[in-house]
Amino acid sequence: MKVMIDIIPRTNSVESDLILEHPDWFYWVYTDTFHEYYPPYVPGLGETLAPKPEYLPYIYSSQAVWNHIRKFSYAPNIIDPEKWNRVVKEYHETPGASILDLVSREFGLTVAPAFSDHINDVQPPWTDVTFFRMYMDHPVESQKYLGGQELPPYILFDTIKSNLYKGNIINEGLWATLSNIIPFYQQNYGIDGARIDMGHALPSELIHRIIANARTNDPDFCFIAEELQDENAKVSRDNGYNMIIGYGFFQEPRTYEHRTHKFMYDSRHLPCPVFAGGETHDTPRLAAREGGRTLSKMLTVMNMFMPNGVPFINSGQEVYEIQPMNTGLDCRNYEQYVLPHNDRYFGKLALFDKFAIHYLNHMRWELPDTLEAVSKIRKDHLSTFTKLENFVSLGFDYLSDPAIGFGYIEEGKRGHYNNNVFIIVASTDMYSPIDVTVHLEDLRTQSGNTWCTGSLLFSTHEWQREVHEFDGNRNLRVHLQPGEVKIIKL
């Protein structure tokens, strides 16, 4: 077993011991205007836009933005060092004291909550966390719009997106602290990898430090990038990540739009592996999507074999949990309330509330039993399914056919005339049986396989048997129940 942790070097709790030692690593706002603290609206732009440089003139022309900036103050130790030292002394001498309460009393300040770096995002502030100051000056690109004013550090769409908007003065002490978090866990707990939350918004130089420090201890230490856009996979790979999370949670459930097909087939072209998963802790549950448990089962099995994919199962997915942990991504307006009203966890979100997964539901064994069988096939032929050169995409009579097909040439058996290929085919119709023809021309050409008798190794709907349903062109004719997956050895 390998153990990975999740680290979030971009943010910190709004109240922590680091404030005592380094108050200037944080952003501070006046308490008398704190009730008005909210991401400012930028007129003339749409909703939820990435903070591209071409939008800066709009941002800094907004009166709401300037009203927001004026809510910020310099750190309390800069305003009055002697008073700050007295506050710290009082904190250490008072059991149970809150540093924020003391700062509020003496300075009228508090730490500024974080919010989304996307312009006009509908999300409210993230009141439990704040951003670290990655640089000790304002971003170079943003300084053009400040008119030479001396302004306190402030949180805004650009200042917190430090992969794009960098300053001239690195916060060296902070960077040293952040880049030594993983080595601490390696040396004390022997961890094997980490996901860097919001790493895409960090300066590339800091990411390189974090990765280099970890791999000094363990050259095989694995890094997962919280990169959702597949087109940025190359950047993540170049930065030293092993894999990305990707956009599967959005694409995979949309079978009728053929987004499932596009994501699964196109994954092989990415420069690094991507999560093969249809749900995360931020998204709707697969079992609560259109297609329900049928969809969840089909995707869970197919993700075990997706080319260039890293199979990912979100906690609770294995028992068809329908209540999301959070409603951060791709959620419907009723997502939080999918449980029956009389369920004790109705409306509860695991990221915020006391919650227990419904492990005792009557279907709790179906996916674990399925995965036990499927995982053995994958494990027994791991080198076959994890090398892209063994993969051959399988098509059907029509692009509109509701089916997905993967072909794999068994490792070390290319050129054999039989017993050397795997055919994995699934129906993406969740409601009706289908009959389709799986075209094997490319698979046969590349593998050398000419055989027309196969073995059904696994099906979600029938027992193992011999397979003889080939047409005159030696293509495979298959009948599939709704959401059925078949794995055939030929």
Please give the residue ranges for each predicted region:
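C-terminal beta-strand-rich structural cap/linker in extracellular carbohydrate-active enzymes
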Residues: 466-490
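N-terminal small/glycine-rich loop or linker at the start of catalytic domains
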Residues: 134, 138-167
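Loop/helix patches that line or flank the sugar-binding groove of alpha-linked glycan CAZymes
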Residues: 277-280, 285, 289-454, 482
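Solvent-exposed beta-strand/loop surfaces of large extracellular or lumenal domains
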Residues: 453-473
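Active-site neighborhood of glycoside hydrolase catalytic domains
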Residues: 157-233
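Acidic/aromatic-lined carbohydrate-recognition and catalytic surfaces
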Residues: 1-144, 200-229, 427, 483-485
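Glycan-recognition surfaces
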Residues: 144-146, 150-151, 216-301, 305-312, ...
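The substrate-binding groove and active-site-proximal loops of carbohydrate-active enzymes
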Residues: 14, 158-174, 192-201, 244-252, ...
